[in-house]
Amino acid sequence: MAAEGRVQRVASELQKVISLLLRTRIKDAKLASATITEVDLSKDLSYAKIYYTCLAIEDAEYIDKAFEKSKGFFRSSIAKSLSLRIVPNLKFIYDTSLDYGMQMEEKIQQALEADSKIIKQDDKSLQENYKQNDKETKAEKLR
């Protein structure tokens, strides 16, 4: 259990260090615009999957290549910043969860709009039925 806590703490520190490096040391504007969303670290701390996202989806491929070229820089900077026996091998992965979440949000909005239209149609039908029933009731009373 203690090992899992350490893994989480080191992963959190890796995320902070890489985010700071992106903001302060990276001159490539597209790469610097990437946001680190999560770090998944192996139990032995030797491998790290760094999940990132970017505002412009069309830049994702460029950013992926830039991260690949910059792995050495990130590893050496991590070694200087954190006192780890082994600096993990880094694998940068585009995080699709935000895109997926946005697609789901869009589908939910479409479903809500469709439901709203159905409810409006049902309300109109009910009102017409009430009017018809009122007319019939009045006609019966007059007889």
UniProtKB/Swiss-Prot annotation:
Transmembrane segments: none annotated. One of its GO terms (biological process) is maturation of SSU-rRNA. Its main location: cytoplasm. Keywords: Cytoplasm, Ribosome biogenesis. One of several proteins that assist in the late maturation steps of the functional core of the 30S ribosomal subunit. Associates with free 30S ribosomal subunits (but not with 30S subunits that are part of 70S ribosomes or polysomes). Required for efficient processing of 16S rRNA. May interact with the 5'-terminal helix region of 16S rRNA. One of its GO terms (molecular function) is ribosomal small subunit binding. Residues 123-143 are annotated as: Disordered. Monomer. Binds 30S ribosomal subunits, but not 50S ribosomal subunits or 70S ribosomes. This is Ribosome-binding factor A. GO terms for cellular component: cytosol. Belongs to the RbfA family. The keyword Hydrolase does not apply. It comes from Francisella tularensis subsp. novicida (strain U112). The keyword Cell division does not apply. It is found in: Cytoplasm.
